[in-house]
Curated annotation (Swiss-Prot):
Residues 1-25 form a transit peptide. The gene is HOGA1. The record marks 168 as: Involved in proton transfer during cleavage. This is 4-hydroxy-2-oxoglutarate aldolase, mitochondrial. It catalyses: (4S)-4-hydroxy-2-oxoglutarate = glyoxylate + pyruvate; (4R)-4-hydroxy-2-oxoglutarate = glyoxylate + pyruvate.
Amino acid sequence: MLGPQVWSSVRQGLSRSLSRNVGVWASGEGKKVDIAGIYPPVTTPFTATAEVDYGKLEENLHKLGTFPFRGFVVQGSNGEFPFLTSSERLEVVSRVRQAMPKNRLLLAGSGCESTQATVEMTVSMAQVGADAAMVVTPCYYRGRMSSAALIHHYTKVADLSPIPVVLYSVPANTGLDLPVDAVVTLSQHPNIVGMKDSGGDVTRIGLIVHKTRKQDFQVLAGSAGFLMASYALGAVGGVCALANVLGAQVCQLERLCCTGQWEDAQKLQHRLIEPNAAVTRRFGIPGLKKIMDWFGYYGGPCRAPLQELSPAEEEALRMDFTSNGWL
């Protein structure tokens, strides 16, 4: 059961989030944030001694801020959030809020394993500047994470969150796909505005769009590898790791899809598939950070137990970008 401190934090977070005037949901008003657009999931830079390098974080954000992104995602999978302390997670959100352009949205990953911890983290992230909370599925006890359990979890979080909630399904990391029936039920909640689906099943994305079409609910593709297909099926944007290095190109793909230039979109999408796979399922965060170094950003090391790429892996990573004309 949530204690008095949490309830107090909820009220404080609600007051602060409303005062920032970003058009988010407020109890009784029915207002929601429009999350359509492209978001890079920001990496967390570390020093050689594994401390968070906030200076490099701000440098990366200043460079990324030159592209027409809708906003930024922090403390998602690419932010290595499972390896950060609670205070580090909040400090990262705060620093990003201060460094990013004021007209961009900040989606902060606030998911934890328990419902109570998720509520507390969500409220705290609202207080340090998040516009919306992106909440990953709890998964440690995934054998018991039925649709009913997940609906209960997300409903409680959304009820108590002072900012809108975005559902986050990433089965490659959690071993758990948020069931479509649960998504449909949750889409009816006035404080759940959308979903990031990283599973890669575009038929599932199309089905979710179809079944939630009567709700004020938006779907974001979780990867640049299936961004065009997702747009064709009704998604409104994407959270794309590849946008950390090919921001202009991912935004161009968005523009081509949104203006119906499908032939040109197809050509560009083809050239993004291999690089995207390299920085996601093939080489993961170590691969993304390495290519960021090559593109003039600060990638740097990951926190243990993640390891840097081997020389052979680096060469394969380079080939995936050079063969498609990006290096």
